[in-house]
C-alpha cells in the first residue's frame, strides 16, 4: 500500500518537473524573434532549432 502511494507520488512529481521544464522552453522557442526575458536561453534554443 505504502509503496503504491510512493510510486504514484514519484510518477506525479516526474510529470510535474518535466512539464515545469518543458513549458518555458516551448514558450521561449515561440518567442525567439521577440525580446525575451531570458535572451541567452533563447539564443541557445534558437541555435539548436534554427
UniProtKB/Swiss-Prot annotation:
Localization (cell): Secreted
Residue list for modification Asparagine amide: 49
Chief location category: secreted
Taxonomy, superkingdom: Eukaryota
GO cellular component annotations of the record: extracellular region
The keyword Signal appears for this protein: yes
Task of the protein: Potent anti-inflammatory agent. At low concentrations, mediates the degranulation of mast cells thus evoking an inflammatory response. Also acts as a neurotoxin capable of blocking a class of voltage-gated potassium channels.
Protein name: Mast cell degranulating peptide
